[in-house]
């Protein structure tokens, strides 16, 4: 495996969710088309480089479809996968999410994680933030070894030592 790092695998397929009601227009109906991608890495440095590249890939995609100027990389809850994640949130009056935006820096955070600890981590002050309605159009997050350890997905380094693979989700 280590000679293949980074390895990225994706799928595009119909997804079905038992949503109580449709949300965010056609983006969160009960059936929708979704792309999932997972990356596998042998070092933190390799993972971080790939993660940053994927941020830029998504920004490029949103720009090409005409929503780049309205879409912000947003610090958010990681849900069941990680403590925090990055969402791509598009500003719209029809949005059901609330983000707080520092317009001077373009830094955004989801309302669900707005607290003093996060503000300090992002070097933001609450007074400089403006509230905006938005729709989540994508997210990426660091899985670390959450799944590789329980499934014993590992690689052997040049010293013949086994290590769990680092994973990302996009």
Predicted regions and their residues:
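TRNA-recognition modules of translation machinery and tRNA-sensing kinases, especially anticodon-binding
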Residues: 1-170
């Amino acid at each position: 495996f280590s000679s293949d790092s980074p390895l990225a695998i994706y799928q595009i397929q119909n997804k079905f969710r038992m949503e109580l009601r449709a949300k965010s227009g056609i983006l969160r109906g009960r059936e929708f088309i979704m792309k999932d991608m997972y990356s596998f890495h042998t070092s933190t440095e390799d993972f971080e480089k790939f993660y940053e590249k994927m941020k830029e890939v998504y920004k490029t995609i949103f720009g090409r479809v005409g929503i780049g100027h309205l879409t912000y990389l947003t610090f958010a809850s990681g849900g069941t996968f990680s403590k925090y994640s990055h969402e791509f949130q598009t500003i719209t009056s029809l949005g059901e999410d609330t983000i707080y935006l520092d317009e001077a820096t373009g830094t955004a955070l989801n309302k669900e994680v707005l607290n003093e600890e996060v503000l300090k981590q992002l070097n933001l002050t609450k007074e400089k933030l403006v509230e905006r309605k938005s729709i989540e159009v994508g997210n990426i997050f660091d899985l670390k070894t959450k799944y590789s350890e329980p499934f014993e997905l590992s690689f052997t380094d040049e010293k013949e030592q086994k290590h769990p693979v680092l994973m990302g989700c996009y």
